[in-house]
């Protein structure tokens, strides 16, 4: 009898091969043939699921984004109601850590996601996913900032612009930490990432608290 292949699982195996190639050789090397070799498949097997390299890269970008967003949404669902609760603070740091290359799985995803976002500047077929995923991640960061900084004064007239600025500041910090950790892992260790992130969050709270 012919072997039954789980199509969803096979696609994820192929996406995994794409991410490994991006991490070791760069996105430009992620052709159908290179990905097939990395996945231990015939090129025809990859073509069964993806018509072209562009099709493969677009699918992989969405898959990586969705993995990140799934982890983020799962983590945000576990946040407690009190911004000053130590458990909530720890949960926030855990949630934001999903953006960062703190272990092998997250390092592969972070490397691929940043590479795809950069490539979207000059590859139009990636632009829609770059916009979608950025907006989705920004929405999660916005929820975190609102939870951390806005609960004490939910009706503050000037809170909106301040929260937007804080959210953009946090997004930029996360991008910078991820890039630094990927480029200089011997210096920006997982422990250093966590320490910098915790310091940043505490600094945001102090600045917002001082403004009230």
What are these regions (language model features)?
Residues 69, 105-114, 124-151, 195:
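Amphipathic alpha-helical packing segments from all-alpha helical-bundle domains
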Residues 59, 73-109, 167-170:
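Hydrophobic alpha-helical connector segments
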Residues 1-9, 20, 155-156, 208-212:
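N-terminal intrinsically disordered/low-complexity leader segments
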Residues 97-104, 111-122, 200:
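Helix-loop "lid/cap" segments that line or gate small-molecule binding pockets
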Residues 13, 17-59:
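Helix-turn-helix
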Residues 10-19, 35, 60-64, 68, ...:
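Generic hydrophobic, amphipathic alpha-helix propensity
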Residues 127-131, 148-212:
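Hydrophobic/aromatic-rich alpha-helical bundle segments in the mid-to-C-terminal region
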């Amino acid at each position: 009898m012919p072997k039954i292949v789980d199509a969803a699982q096979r696609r994820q195996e192929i996406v995994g091969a794409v991410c490994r190639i991006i991490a070791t050789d760069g996105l430009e090397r992620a052709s159908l043939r290179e990905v097939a070799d990395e996945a231990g498949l015939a090129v025809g097997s990859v073509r069964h699921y993806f018509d072209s390299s562009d099709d493969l890269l677009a699918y992989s970008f969405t898959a990586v984004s969705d993995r990140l967003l799934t982890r983020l949404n799962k983590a945000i669902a576990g946040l407690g109601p009190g911004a000053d609760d130590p458990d909530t603070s720890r949960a926030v740091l855990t949630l934001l850590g999903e953006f960062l290359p703190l272990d092998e799985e997250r390092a592969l995803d972070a490397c691929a996601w940043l590479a795809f976002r950069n490539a979207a500047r000059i590859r139009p077929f990636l632009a829609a996913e770059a916009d979608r995923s950025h907006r989705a991640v920004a929405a999660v960061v916005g929820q975190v900032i609102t939870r951390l900084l806005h609960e004490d004064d939910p009706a503050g007239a000037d809170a909106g612009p301040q929260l937007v600025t804080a959210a953009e500041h946090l997004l930029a910090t996360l991008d910078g930490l991820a890039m630094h950790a990927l480029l200089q892992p011997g210096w920006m260790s997982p422990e250093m990432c966590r320490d910098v992130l915790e310091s940043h969050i505490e600094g945001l709270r102090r600045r917002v608290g001082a403004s009230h």
